[in-house]
């Protein structure tokens, strides 16, 4: 999974995404994004429009920053995909409502993996304290070499998949 900020250009009928990849933080189209990802999911935070607007502004201010190959969530110099989005929804001087996340150690880095966001959504839904709404999930079957829209239930179970699941189908 990757995490992105999405908006639509209604004049060109195109969706744009802010993403953090090896070349850094930049804007790409949804079509280009789909070419280099096995799975794509869209979720929305359950915040009011002003908070979402502030998060978008915060994310756009990071365009051009480097990718965080060191996996240091606490860095404000470079970012991985999940940090790019989750940091935009952390508490700041203008709001105290934020996404509640628990960072994880992976190898020598501290990160918030995208699968953890999916796991959080699954557990939050069970406890009826969701902070995120499901929008869409594009799943894939490597065996059939195809992608397809899948349901919320499959998305919420997807965090349990092995990273090698597309080889095992």
Residue ranges and their predicted role:
Residues 72-169:
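Activation targets extended, charge/polar-rich intrinsically disordered C-terminal tails
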Residues 34-95:
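Long, low-complexity intrinsically disordered regions
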Residues 1-43, 67-79:
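Glycine-rich catalytic cores of cysteine/serine-nucleophile enzymes that process amide/ester linkages
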Residues 24, 49, 105:
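Residue-level detector of flexible, active-site-proximal loop/helix-junction positions
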Residues 6-7, 31, 56, 106, ...:
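Generic structural signal for short, flexible, solvent-exposed coil/loop and linker residues
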């Amino acid at each position: 999974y990757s995490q992105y900020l999405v908006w639509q250009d209604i004049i060109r009928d195109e969706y744009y995404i802010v993403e953090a990849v090896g070349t850094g933080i930049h804007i790409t189209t949804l079509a280009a994004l789909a070419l280099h990802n096995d799975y794509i999911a869209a979720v929305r935070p359950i915040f009011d429009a002003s908070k979402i607007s502030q998060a978008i502004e915060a994310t756009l201010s990071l365009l051009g920053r480097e990718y965080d190959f060191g996996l240091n969530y606490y860095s404000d110099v470079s970012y991985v995909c999940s940090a790019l989005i989750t940091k935009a929804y952390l508490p700041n001087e203008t709001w105290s409502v934020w996404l509640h996340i628990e960072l994880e150690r992976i190898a020598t880095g501290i990160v918030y993996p995208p699968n953890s966001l999916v796991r959080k959504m699954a557990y939050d839904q069970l406890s009826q304290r969701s902070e995120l709404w499901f929008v869409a999930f594009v799943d894939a079957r490597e065996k059939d070499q195809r992608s397809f829209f899948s349901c919320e239930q499959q998305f919420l179970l997807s965090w349990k998949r092995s990273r090698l699941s597309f080889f095992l189908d």
